[in-house]
């Protein structure tokens, strides 16, 4: 199982390590835009992303937020725990920007009185649509308890 490619996405490749609970995550120099429609490479992107990711996960550890991160043996690699992937992206907004402006006709930069939490289905083919909790549960992408925990952690990290 060691060094067997388990998954490849737009930004990372996951390899088996011989331990079924641990994967090697290798960052890629590939860059994409438009849900993967535009592709190119950027020298050292993998090492920059790995370094930033490492610092974020180490900081989260100091806040007692559990993550999949174990260690970073190389400039573009991390050992991570094997986890169940929930295909949901959690976005917290303090100010209007991006898709929320287009969806609701809000001017960019408008501040919100309280952080807004939105959930999106991670699916490039569908352009990562906004999704409701009932749909997430009905489609078995996450349970109500998992959603509650995701939202709680998102607010802590925010």
Protein language model regions, located:
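Active-site loop/lid in soluble adenylation, ligation, and acyl-transfer enzymes
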Residues: 2-120
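ATP-dependent phospho-/nucleotidyl transfer catalytic cores
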Residues: 79-81, 101-158
């Amino acid at each position: 199982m060691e060094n067997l490619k388990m998954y490849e996405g737009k930004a990372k490749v996951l390899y088996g390590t011989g331990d079924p609970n641990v994967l090697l995550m290798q960052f890629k120099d590939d860059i994409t835009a438009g849900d993967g429609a535009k592709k190119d490479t950027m020298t050292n992107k993998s090492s920059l992303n790995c370094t930033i990711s490492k610092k974020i996960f180490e900081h989260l550890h100091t806040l007692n937020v559990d993550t999949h991160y174990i260690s970073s043996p190389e400039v573009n690699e991390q050992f991570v725990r094997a986890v169940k992937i929930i295909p949901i992206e959690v976005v917290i907004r303090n100010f209007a920007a991006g898709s929320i402006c287009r969806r609701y006709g809000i001017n960019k930069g408008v501040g919100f009185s309280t952080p807004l939490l939105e959930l999106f289905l991670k699916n490039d083919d569908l352009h990562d649509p906004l999704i409701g909790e009932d749909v997430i549960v009905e489609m078995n992408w996450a349970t109500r308890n998992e959603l509650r925990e995701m939202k709680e952690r998102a607010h802590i990290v925010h």
